[in-house]
Structures are given as C-alpha cells and as structure tokens.
Amino acid sequence: MSSRIDRDVINALIAGHFADPFSVLGMHQTQAGLEVRALLPDATDVWVIEPKTGRKVGKLECLDARGFFCGVLPRRKNFFRYQLAVTWHGQQNLIDDPYRFGPLIQEMDAWLLSEGTHLRPYETLGAHADTMDGVTGTRFSVWAPNARRVSVVGQFNYWDGRRHPMRLRKESGIWELFIPGAHNGQLYKFELLDANGNLRIKADPYAFEAQMRPETASMICGLPEKVTPSEERQKANQFDAPISIYEVHLGSWRRHTDNNFWLSYRELADQLVPYAKWMGFTHLELLPVNEHPFDGSWGYQPTGLYAPTRRFGTRDDFRYFINAAHAAGLNVILDWVPGHFPSDEFSLAEFDGTHLYEHSDPREGYHQDWNTLIYNYGRREVSNYLVGNALYWMERFGIDALRVDAVASMIYRDYSRKEGEWIPNEFGGRENLEAIEFLRNTNRIIGEQVPGAVSMAEESTDFAGVTRPPETGGLGFWYKWNLGWMHDTLDYMKLDPVYRQYHHDKLTFGMLYNHTENFVLPLSHDEVVHGKKSILDRMPGDAWQKFANLRAYYGWMWAFPGKKLLFMGNEFAQGREWNHDASLDWHLLEGGDNWHHGVQRLVRDLNHTYRHHKALHELDFDAYGFEWLVVDDNERSVLIFVRRDKAGNEIIVASNFTPVPRHDYRFGINQPGRWREILNTDSMHYHGSNTGNGGVVHSDEIESHGRQHSLNLTLPPLATIWLMREGE
C-alpha cells in the first residue's frame, strides 16, 4: 500500500477539485516498484491485468470507500500496457485505464492553437474517435485556460464528473483526455470547476453533432470526409456567372400536412432540390443550419457552430442534402453567424468562469438588439475558432459560399448604441479593428484554401470596400448585399403610380454607386417579417394591379446589374408574411391556373432567360455592361436601359411603371436591326393584359435621344419587357 498519497489529494480528487489527475492516477514508478492508482467510484474489487496473457499481476487496495484504489507491483520496474478488472455491483468488467496514455495534442498543434493560426482547429479540439496503443476510444480536448478542473461526462460514465478528470496542457490552456471505449453516437459534455469555484456543465464548442432542443448534449461523431469541389461549382460563383439565389428556411419551406412537422434533410433533398432546379435557380441559400436552441431565432443565434441542427436529421442526412443539391447543379450558400452568440448557460457564455469567448465589458461584449454576446475577435483562440468553422463547412460539407450575417454590427463599435454605451478603439474611432481584421483574415484564408468558394456580406452601411481586397483597405468579400437598392426600389414600388414621377430617382440612384462593390440584389426573408407585409401586399392598387406591379418589378430586378436573391414564397407571390412555424402557402397553387401560377411561371422564365443570355450577367460589375437609353422620362415613369456582354451583344430592357399603356413610344438605340421581344411581364402567359409588340420590331433610321436609330414600341401597363437583337 502507498503511503505517499496525501489524504487531502484523495479528497480533492473525489470532490472534483484536483487540477492534475495524471500526477496521481495511472501507473507511476516508485522505489518499491510500479504503483497503479485509480479512481473508480462504486467499485468493490480492482485487479491489474496483463492483456497479452490475461494474467492478474496485482490487486489494488481500496484506500477510500468512495472509490480510490492503489497498489504496488513490486517485481515491475518498466511501464507496460495494462488493463483493470473492476467489479461493480457484483459484475466484473475489463477496462483500459485512461490515465495510462500520454499527452494527446502534438506540440506543434498546441503552439498553433495558442497563436490562433491553426487553420483547422476542429481536427484537434473536440471529440475524435481514435485508436491509441491498440485501444479504441475517443480523445476529448477543450480550451478552458481559467478552469480549475475539467472532466468529460457522458453516457459512458454515468455523467459523473469524478470519473474522467482531464489533463491540463498549461502552455495552451487546453484540457485533454483519451477515454477507451467511448464511441460514436454517445452523448457527452464537459464539466468544469470554473475560475470562481462554480460548477458548470458545457456543451462542446467543437461538437460535430448535438442533441435537438430542448436537450443540449454533444454527440461523439466522426469528422466528415473532405469534399472536393467540381470545376463547374467553382465557375458558378464567378463574377461573370449567372447567379440567381433561392433563399430558404428549411423548417418552413414545406411541412407535413398531417402534423405540421418539418421535412427531413432527405425529404428536402427529394422535394426542395428538384423544385429549385425546375425553377431555374442556380444557388440555394440556407438560413443558418447550425444547432440553435430557439426556433424563433431562425438559426441566427447558434450554440453549435460545428453541428448541423438535428431538427431535420443527422449530420450525414445533411451531407446527403448538400450532395443532392450539387448533383442537381445547384451551388449551396450557408448563412453564417460569426457576429454574436446567445447567452445560454450550456454554451459559450462565461465558458470557464471568465469572459473567454466574449468581451467582459458589456459595452463591447453585449448586443442590446438581440440580447446576445459578441465574440472577442482580438483573442486569437476565438478568431481561430471562427475561421476554422468557415473552412469546416466548405471543406467537409462542400458548402460553396458563406453569407455573413450582420457585418455592420461587427465592424462598428457603436452599432445600435447611444453615446456612452460603447468604447472607442485604440485610435479613438468607432471601427472594431479586431473584427475588421478577423473578416479580412477569414476571406483571405477562404481564397487560399478553398478555390472557387466565395463569401457574401450582409452589410447595411456605406463602409467603403466591402468587396475590395484587404491590401487596398477592403474587407475581402466577393459579394455584398445591395440593401440600398432593395430599400429604394421597394419604396418606389409601394407608391401609387400617380406619385411615382416624383420619386423617379429611387430607381436610377442605384447606378450612381453600382460599380463601387460587387452587388447582390436581395429580396430576402428580412423583407417579409415583422409587419413589413409580403412583397405582393406592398404593391399598390387592386388585386390585378398588385400582381402586375410585382411582375414588372421582378422583370426590372432580373435585368438590373447585380446577382439575384429571392426568398422562398416570393416566387409565387405569397400574400401573407413569412411564418417560420408553418409551411409556405402552397395551397395558392392548387386548383385552376391563377395569378400565383403566373408569377411562378414568370420567375421561372426570368431565371432561364437570365442564365441563357450573357448580356444579363457577364458584366454585372463592369460599366460596359450597362447603359441608360431613357433615364429622364419621369412624367410617364418609363425607364429603358441596355445590358451588354463582352462580345457587344445587347438586350434592351424597358419598364413602364404606370397603368397607362404607352403606344408609339420611340427611343434611340445603339444597334439597328430586328429586335425580338423575349420577355413581357404583361403576357397572358403570366395573367397579364397581353399588351405587347407582336414578337418582333424593326428599328427605324429616325434620330431619337441623341442616337441615329430608334425603336417605336408599345410599352404595356405596369410591365417590363426585354428585347434581343436578332439581326439586321
């Protein structure tokens, strides 16, 4: 029996207050021979076993009835592989001792994690099934530098924090432990004695899978295999590509009619994916799928940044959905939330008893609008956690793009704050320099590590250079949502047509700054909630005029420079606001052909026509790709412009935003010849009045608008038409 183990040490171990379990537990060399110590609550008998022979080589004596065992093997001097035969409740179990294994994290990994430069921290931290010294199990590691003790608790140890206290790697603040026998599918958490002596139970920040709310445990789950993007997927994100995005909330796109329950990832793969393909969209954008506790946050308050939500199935089911989208030729964009996280006790908030992931001062670390906490981007381990997450989704799931939510709230310290409620940066300014550097670094790493993948910014201010390279002072995003265009055009469209002539600039102003960024034109989920009404319901007039206005607006939007984004339901003119707790109003498309079918057909035709003609997308961000033909006819609310591709092919776009047909409307053109009407939002095919130009019109050598040749058209009421030059 050992006399060297102090009673206070045993008490501290059993009470869960001992920070260095490996200094006591496991096998140790002593003058009397090898000494084996184990903490095995509720055990009654413990033997040391030699695995090769199965022979008992020594019995451990119970030094404390609460489960501390110790024994000396006097004839042994060199460490050897051993097992423990433990009797619990009259039944003997053969186990491998977690405390006989050496350090898990390599020194280089520990150094990179501490420096915040480990590109893929998720390959080291978290829970990873592994085999060590011939023993299968799971290695656990978690960053909690200020905790006094950390244990792994889970289904494999009765959720008992005494059984598996972890080793602290002081140089990095990471706790680690290999637990033999712990396997994929088992639930676990980390139990911490925090910096203040309080007990905390935390989910794993790096968990690859988690329980569905209201449960909060993490799940042991293997790291997904890497996904290699195809050349076609890489090209589909380029600036000259047609990009038409269908924005979807997976929980409310469609539901089971019998119980209003969600569709699974696999059901969505079978229903949503072919629908989006049929509609002609090029990209699917998913509202956040990271695990989150509150349905009403729509995923924008995530607690499991590395775990796809279990609401719709398993992690592998989600991969199945992504693969189905790719097989259908759809790229997938994931809404990504690196700006803030909820204050739920089981998550990142005060993780080790200190403000580890967030700022300690609420003027920097608390988001008043959303009652959430703000990441401390200046802490290297925190920014590393987030940058690694971006790579994780792209490399391990094949996500083609990330849309970063609420960028303005990240880059401005005074965002939504009054004077005295925020702290200036080191230079006295309002910019969050650490957040700006984090975004630049993330975008740089995406570009270097995942060729063809891109990022998009929802940035609501006039911050200069969101889509410009960091070396020129930009943030390095590929695309930025044009929220200014969206607000201006919706403000215009909601006006009674009689008043539109006084607000003509709302449609033209966007071109004054159009080439300052690479823009996406978004009609997103944010525009159909919180009392804003549906897009259809914002249109003025009676029912016929509402639909006509909407069709004209869509025709304008799809032709205007910039990539396109449409939230689900808008493609068939849903009449009510979006409700995340219910399905879209698919019943509007039941029965006979109606106005909703007309809008749906229009959006489908817009997508396919837009994709087919390079003039509509190839030079979105080049001044050569756009030219006004009629910009000043505010009295009749008529606007006409040309879209152009690199080869000089032109498409003419003409919009009449009044209910008065404009017959014999003459305007100058660049290229004389025969022009075909390839799209008319007033067509009877879309349930319009079918006013138009009979398919083909020829130019006249009559000067107009400063040009030698002109066209004489009929402009339908509340409509947009597209014309393509067919020849001389």
From Swiss-Prot:
Coiled coil: none annotated. GO terms for biological process: glycogen biosynthetic process. Keywords: Carbohydrate metabolism, Glycogen biosynthesis, Glycogen metabolism, Glycosyltransferase, Transferase. GO terms for molecular function: 1,4-alpha-glucan branching enzyme activity; cation binding; hydrolase activity, hydrolyzing O-glycosyl compounds. Its EC number is 2.4.1.18. One of its GO terms (cellular component) is cytosol. SUPFAM superfamilies: (Trans)glycosidases, E set domains, Glycosyl hydrolase domain. Pathway: Glycan biosynthesis; glycogen biosynthesis. Transmembrane segments: none annotated. CDD domains: AmyAc_Glg_BE, E_set_GBE_prok_N. Pfam families: Alpha-amylase, Alpha-amylase_C, CBM_48, GlgB_N. The active site is at D405, E458. It catalyses: Transfers a segment of a (1->4)-alpha-D-glucan chain to a primary hydroxy group in a similar glucan chain. It comes from the Bacteria. Belongs to the glycosyl hydrolase 13 family. GlgB subfamily. Monomer. Catalyzes the formation of the alpha-1,6-glucosidic linkages in glycogen by scission of a 1,4-alpha-linked oligosaccharide from growing alpha-1,4-glucan chains and the subsequent attachment of the oligosaccharide to the alpha-1,6 position. This is 1,4-alpha-glucan branching enzyme GlgB. It comes from Salmonella choleraesuis (strain SC-B67). The gene is glgB.
